[in-house]
């Protein structure tokens, strides 16, 4: 009996990691490469962020926090949405995650049943289909054209929707 689940066996090696590693190898031999792999910033963390982190650590703010975000962070997010987007939210409507992919994966795991379809317009982030597969769903890729700014058209979306469609990434 294998220790690896059947779900994990369906996942392919990460193209993002492969292209990132290839770029590193080429740079190491002196090639001028523009990396289009992992989304690492090409700049150092700004000093105000470093200083805030140091201050928090020195102030003893080193323990686990609420999984969905601290009250202070939620308050800052609410303020941002009100000021910049004129949107009103309560703290119960705000959930913080470690990144967009993690939040999407959690949503898929919480809501998809085996065979549920998720419409994914292409081009897309390479992880999306595997995230859907791990959650038991079926990715349904819809190719988008440059002439449409690589956005799914209402007609293409309508054609992609079936009785098994449960989610649409946009």
Residue ranges of predicted features:
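Conserved PLP-anchoring active-site segment centered on the Schiff-base-forming lysine
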Residues: 110-132
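Active-site phosphate-binding strand-loop segment of PLP-dependent enzymes
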Residues: 140, 145-170
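CheY-like receiver
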Residues: 22, 107, 156-160
């Amino acid at each position: 009996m294998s220790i690896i689940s059947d779900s994990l066996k369906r996942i392919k090696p990460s193209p993002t990691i492969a292209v990132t590693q290839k770029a590193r190898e080429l740079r190491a031999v002196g090639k001028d490469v523009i990396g289009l792999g992992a989304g690492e910033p090409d700049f150092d963390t700004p000093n105000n962020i470093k200083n805030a982190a140091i201050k928090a650590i020195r102030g003893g703010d080193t323990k686990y926090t609420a999984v969905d975000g601290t009250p202070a962070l939620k308050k800052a997010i609410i303020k941002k949405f009100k000021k910049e987007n004129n949107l009103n939210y309560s703290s119960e409507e705000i959930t913080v995650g470690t990144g967009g992919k993690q939040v999407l994966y959690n949503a898929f795991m919480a809501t998809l049943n085996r065979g549920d379809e998720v419409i994914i317009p292409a081009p897309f982030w390479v992880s999306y289909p595997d995230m859907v597969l791990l959650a038991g769903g079926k990715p349904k890729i819809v190719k988008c054209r440059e002439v449409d700014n690589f956005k799914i058209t209402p007609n293409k979306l309508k054609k992609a929707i079936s009785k098994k469609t449960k989610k649409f990434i946009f």
